Regions:
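Conserved RecA-like ASCE P-loop NTPase motor core of nucleic-acid helicases/translocases
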Residues: 268-271, 275-299
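Pre-Walker A (Motif I) flank of P-loop NTPase domains
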Residues: 201, 206-207, 254-260, 284
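Conserved helix-turn-beta segment of the N-terminal RecA-like "Helicase ATP-binding" lobe
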Residues: 295-310
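Extended, charged low-complexity regulatory segments
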Residues: 1-242
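Secondary-structure transition/capping motifs at alpha-helix termini
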Residues: 121-124, 279-284, 305-309
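N-terminal pre-P-loop "Q-motif" helix
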Residues: 237-253
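Walker A/P-loop
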Residues: 254-275
């Protein structure tokens, strides 16, 4: 990869790291808005919640002042969770248990250990907190230990210890992580238990494109090799398209990998609809991804008009 392409590639990696702003899965800050701190939850309420995986916030936080703050932060987390799910299809509400602090190593990260997907369900003036699915180990912790310190975390054993415990932030979990990372004594293993909005999608994206390929280099340099196509190929499209749009559709039908940069109002939505129609005409399927649900909704009228038998 050329120097210019590598610089562009590194810039893209930095942009991916910044997706969504500060990420509690890479640097947990317990003082931010939209975070319910359960580290000092009432022992009885926490014990019942640990067994049933459901509980009212009022039972978990019984001090009036602390409960008022927890209720306010739960409302913020709920609003943000609903917005991210509606607009981007992301489920972002998690219980985070335990943390590893890397800051003594001049690495600005405080990474939670275990994630457990959660729900906040309105119950009158209160919220019911519910845990769903199974807990997972934070991918950011696994990858940071592997690439920064050559430590392979025993994920199955860690999860087994966690699920067998009667606590949501058990000493056995913290002790096991300390044992696994004993080659780096500067690491600080901390007991934390919070509910907040988080997603590990940027982490997976970042490491998924760690090794650039020819497509990445073409995108980074803007230099695309000549493509040889059958000039007589005329795609079957359901709506009008100019010459450039037709070329894009033709390249899709030829199975090429490429990106198109355009401005709003230049017909990109209709071009996508034409691509879907052309693929349908060849009995092919297509998966359409978009950063916002609104973008997908804009395609619906075209589908109703051009693809009534979908």
């Amino acid at each position: 990869m050329s120097d210019s392409a590598n610089q562009q590639f590194q810039a893209w990696l930095e942009q991916i790291r910044g997706i969504g702003g500060p990420n509690p899965l890479t640097n947990l800050d317990t003082e931010v808005a939209g975070l319910v701190n359960l580290e000092r939850a009432h022992p009885v309420g926490l014990s019942l919640f640990t067994r049933s995986h459901r509980g009212l916030l009022a039972n978990l936080v019984r001090d009036p002042i602390s409960y008022s703050k927890a209720l306010t932060e739960a409302k913020r987390a709920k609003i943000k969770s609903d917005r991210l799910e509606a607009n981007f299809g992301l489920e972002t509400l998690y219980l985070l248990a335990g943390a590893v602090d890397f800051r003594h190593l001049k690495l600005d990260r405080r990474i939670p250990i275990v994630l457990w997907q959660a729900e906040l369900i309105r119950k009158g003036a209160d919220f019911e907190l519910a845990l769903t699915g199974d807990p997972i180990v934070n991918p950011e912790l696994i990858l940071t230990l592997k690439y920064e310190f050559n430590i392979n975390l025993d994920v199955p054993r860690l999860l087994r210890l966690y699920t067998e415990s009667t606590d949501l932030a058990p000493i056995t979990l913290l002790s096991f992580v300390a044992e696994q990372t004993k080659s780096v004594p500067e690491l600080e293993i901390q007991r934390t238990l919070v509910v907040t909005n988080a997603t590990y999608a940027p982490t997976l994206m970042l490491h998924d494109i760690k090794r650039p390929n020819s497509l990445v280099e073409e995108l980074a340099t803007g230099v695309v090799p000549d493509r040889h196509h059958d000039k007589d190929l005329i795609p079957l499209i359901p709506a009008d398209a100019d010459q450039e749009q037709t070329q894009v559709i033709t390249r899709v039908l030829n199975g090429e990998s490429f990106a198109v940069e355009t401005l709003p109002g230049t017909g990109y939505t209709q071009t996508v609809a034409n691509i879907l129609g052309a693929l349908a005409g060849e009995s092919k399927r297509a998966l359409v991804l978009a950063p916002r649900r609104q973008t997908l909704n804009e395609l619906v009228p075209y589908e109703d008009t051009y693809l009534p038998l979908r």
